Amino acid sequence: MKTKAFRLFIALLVIQTFLFAQSEGMVFIKGSRYIPLYGRDSTVVEVKDFEIDVYPITNAEYENFVKKYPKWQKSKVIKLFADTSYLSNWKNDLELKASEKPNSPITYISWFAAKDYCECQGKRLPTVDEWEYVAMADETTKDARKKPSYNKQILAWYEAPRFNENTIGEHQKNAWDVHDLHGLVWEWTLDFNSVLITGESRKDVDKDSNLFCGSAAVNATDLMNYAAFMRYAIRGSLKAKYSMKNLGFRCAKDINLK
């Protein structure tokens, strides 16, 4: 009896320590090995434990950032690090236009700016593998990629106009307790330009032909591949200084074991 009570005490202590250690506004992601889609020759990718923001970074959060770090204000940013669209939806260096909502995701943001924002918070941008790992969850399942309902919902979001005007948190959280990975804006990743899609890639399923030909019925795997193809295609078209209406970001963080 004493042994069971001691084990229970230790388990509760570990859980309590973990909860207190989890960074504010972030959730812990238990790493694992998984097979990503598109663009890699290796079969399995290993993702280590990490934390990720629950929500994308908002206009209000980025407004506070540029007040603290003036070099990222729209009139002061070095053009090498941001194109002419950078913060083009802002009224001036420190104010949003009246049409913009403080709690909407920040967009018109370059990779350089997003990366520096995260680093100034003691964080970093998530890698492609980390982002895809968390994003393959639906509301109940951490790998929902083979569920037709999951893939059809994502494709419906992709086919509709981007919703950068909407506020964060309107979509139900996924099984990791993360919101808005799909259906709000595209998101920068740390290594966005590390993946190229070619017909020679082992996982470029059927040389992409089934994704675009109507000769056969579209099954769950086709939808899964097509959704992934669209994400990788967007990433492959970007350059680090680009700023787009429908491109935002969130931050991640390594787990530091002491």
Residue ranges: model-predicted function:
Residues 57, 191-193, 256-257:
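Acidic glycine-/aspartate-rich tracts in secreted/extracellular proteins
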Residues 4, 8, 60, 64, ...:
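Residue-level signal for well-ordered alpha-helical scaffold segments within enzymatic catalytic domains
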Residues 1-23:
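Bacterial Sec-dependent N-terminal signal peptides
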Residues 22-84, 109-112, 183:
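A short glycine-rich, aromatic-capped structural motif
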Residues 44-48, 164, 233-234:
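Flexible glycine/proline-enriched surface loops and loop-helix/loop-strand junctions
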Residues 245-258:
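Short, structured beta-strand segments at or near domain termini in extracellular proteins/domains
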Residues 28, 92-232, 245:
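Functional-site microenvironments in short loops/helix caps that host divalent-cation chemistry
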Residues 39-42, 175, 234-240:
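Short, P/G- and charge-enriched loop/turn segments at secondary-structure junctions
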